[in-house]
Design a protein with these regions (language model features):
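Compact mixed alphabeta submodule
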Residues: 91-206
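OB-fold ssDNA-binding interfaces and closely related basic DNA-contact patches used
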Residues: 1-122, 183-191, 195
Length: 206
């Protein structure tokens, strides 16, 4: 898979520069809609109408008006959530090419603080950028979330050494992140929502 997930413990990654100069891609997804792994929100991503947003907002308002915690909880599950994606090289696995790392707001803010820090500057620069040490902690108790700690290396380094991997091939393997997700029209999203709601009603009726 082009997507990379950190493993428990420490690993070193390098964020790779993109053609448009922005290696931190932001997308909004709806989760918990049936068995769909994540639906791109037409409204938050593209400024189009989104039936899931409309339904979740209506559900939330009803929950507030009727003081119904169940409705509010269901609405929260359906609200669009923000995820960030960056092309990376995993040190020691350069031969696997450029992969895509998905992460949340906290990791994004940490990375941004390094980018804006003049001591580091452009951490993605191919000649004098900075590797990031990522420490991933798998949760020990059910219901808790994994933790991601990020720390830049003290010294800048080159993105790629030809002794380790074919650098031209590595750069050419940078995926266009926008193309990795299926974009649904408003009517497509309505169908997905209707399917989810009808299956939900059916399961409740059993």
């Amino acid at each position: 898979s082009v997507f990379w997930r950190p493993e428990d413990g420490e690993q070193t990654i390098r964020i790779v520069p993109t053609a448009d100069g922005d290696p931190f891609k932001e997308f909004h997804f709806h989760y918990n809609v049936g068995k769909n792994p994540g639906i791109l929100c037409p409204k938050r991503n593209y400024g189009e109408e989104c039936p899931i947003c409309d339904f979740a907002s209506k559900l939330w308002r009803e929950g507030v008006e009727k003081n119904d915690d169940t409705s509010k909880r269901e609405a929260k599950k359906l609200f669009a959530r923000k995820r960030y994606y960056s092309p990376i090289v995993v040190r020691g696995e350069e031969s696997k090419g450029v992969r895509v790392w998905a992460y949340g707001k906290t990791a994004y803010e940490t990375l941004l603080s390094y980018v804006l820090d003049p001591d580091y500057g452009d951490i993605t620069h191919p000649e004098n950028g900075t590797d990031i040490v990522l420490t991933y902690t798998v949760p020990g108790t059910p219901g808790s979330f994994p933790k991601t700690a990020l720390k830049p290396r003290r010294r800048p380094s080159v993105l790629c050494d030809d002794d380790v991997a074919d650098c031209d091939e590595l750069i050419n393997s940078i995926p266009e992140i926008e193309t990795l997700f299926q974009r649904h029209s408003t009517s497509d999203v309505q169908v997905l929502l209707d399917d989810y709601l009808s299956s939900d009603v059916t399961s409740e009726g059993l």
